[in-house]
């Protein structure tokens, strides 16, 4: 076996590397069209995925109502994605009546329910991020000899279906209530059986398994194990319910829905424990909206200053679920409008 001297080996290696480098430099690879399109799409907030801390705000104008959904980076507070919905002025979103809080929005946040309560028979419509606006009333069947009386409540279900509580008034009889499910806003609905009487005075909620239940003023919230509380805004994996009341966050141990009583359906804040957030107490108004981080250790809060002259915008904070110093996401400076809700904190 012959052994080459070290200088010869180094010279050969250097020559090979130089040739390789020249060959590589002579044929540079240009970005493909798909790569450019992907990069442009990622930079466009109107089409980027709604991930991070997702907040909806509603602005009522003289000629329309505008809903804006904005996703913020949970580390920096920078805007990563947006969606805008504009509906006629006679319609409202996030009404607190026919449609309440997060149930006004589809699970993917690409659609929002809009309700017109100006007439005797409420009109229910769906506004989409693609600009479409679809009225659902015309798809609801009205029995012969009856008239459509009320579409009192409307909600999105966990699978994106739309549920509408509808009442008919026969010419010679009492009101008849039916809960309708729309698989989409372009398909005729199907009637859904319920264990409660559907009426324009009975609110309802759709559980994660798509079961409808009657509710009063407070909705049921639970974790993935089914442990929760009425009136909770979020529930941790260990079954701790969290809510906001009187400018403070409160916690309480939850229970399965099957073990709740009528008294549990009311929010008795004296039965809850205040969560200590020292740098917000006394100076900030904590808005009644809250979402947990994907790992369940922190909560996202909206907390504007109590004195409007201090700051007209809403500050976005995250804080440990058990209490402690709240951290402001200082770059989230454009949160404005008259109604706000944190829809999600997702990865």
Predicted regions and their residues:
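Short glycine/acidic-enriched loop and turn motifs that connect beta-strands
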Residues: 59-64, 117-121, 167-174, 217-223, ...
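Bacterial signal peptide processing site
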Residues: 23-25
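Repeated scaffold domains used in trafficking and secretory/extracellular systems
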Residues: 88-105, 144-155, 197-207, 233, ...
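Beta-propeller fold detector
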Residues: 78-87, 133-141, 189-196, 237-245, ...
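An edge-strand/N-cap motif at the start of beta-rich repeat modules
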Residues: 32-81
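Short loop/turn segments that connect beta-strands within beta-propeller blades
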Residues: 74-77, 127-131, 182-187, 236, ...
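Hydrophobic beta-strand positions that form the internal "hydrophobic ladder"
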Residues: 112, 162-163, 212-213, 241, ...
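C-terminal motif of bacterial Sec signal peptides marking the signal peptidase cleavage site
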Residues: 18-21
């Amino acid at each position: 076996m012959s052994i080459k001297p070290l200088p010869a080996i180094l010279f050969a290696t250097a020559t090979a590397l130089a040739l390789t480098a020249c060959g590589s430099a002579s044929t540079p690879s240009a970005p493909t069209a798909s790569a450019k399109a992907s990069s442009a799409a990622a930079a466009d907030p109107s089409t980027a995925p709604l991930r991070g801390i997702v907040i909806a705000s509603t602005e009522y104008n003289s000629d329309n109502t505008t809903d804006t959904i904005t996703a913020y980076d949970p580390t920096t507070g920078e805007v990563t994605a947006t969606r805008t919905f504009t509906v006629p002025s006679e319609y409202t979103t996030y009404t607190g009546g026919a449609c309440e809080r997060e149930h006004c929005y589809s699970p993917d946040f690409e659609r929002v329910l809009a309700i017109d309560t100006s007439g005797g028979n409420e009109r229910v419509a769906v506004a989409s991020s693609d600009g479409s606006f679809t009225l659902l009333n015309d798809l609801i069947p009205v029995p012969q000899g009856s008239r459509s009386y009320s579409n009192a409540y409307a909600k999105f279900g966990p699978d994106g279906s739309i549920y509408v509580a509808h009442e008919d008034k026969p010419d010679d009889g009492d009101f008849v209530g039916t809960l309708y499910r729309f698989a989409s806003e372009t398909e005729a609905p199907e009637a859904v059986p319920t264990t409660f009487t559907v009426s324009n005075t009975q609110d309802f909620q759709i559980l994660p398994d798509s079961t409808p239940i009657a509710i009063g003023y407070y909705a049921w919230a639970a974790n993935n194990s089914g442990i929760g509380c009425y009136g909770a805004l979020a529930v941790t994996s260990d079954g701790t319910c969290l809510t906001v009341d009187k400018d403070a966050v409160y916690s309480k141990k939850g229970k399965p829905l099957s073990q709740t009583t009528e008294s549990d359906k009311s929010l008795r804040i004296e039965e809850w424990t205040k969560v200590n957030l020292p740098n917000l107490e006394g100076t900030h108004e904590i808005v009644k909206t809250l979402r947990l981080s994907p790992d369940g250790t922190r909560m996202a809060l909206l907390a504007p200053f109590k004195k409007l002259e201090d700051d007209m915008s809403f500050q976005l904070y995250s804080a440990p679920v058990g209490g402690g110093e709240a951290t402001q996401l200082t770059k989230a400076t454009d949160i404005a409008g008259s109604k706000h809700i944190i829809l999600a904190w997702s990865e």
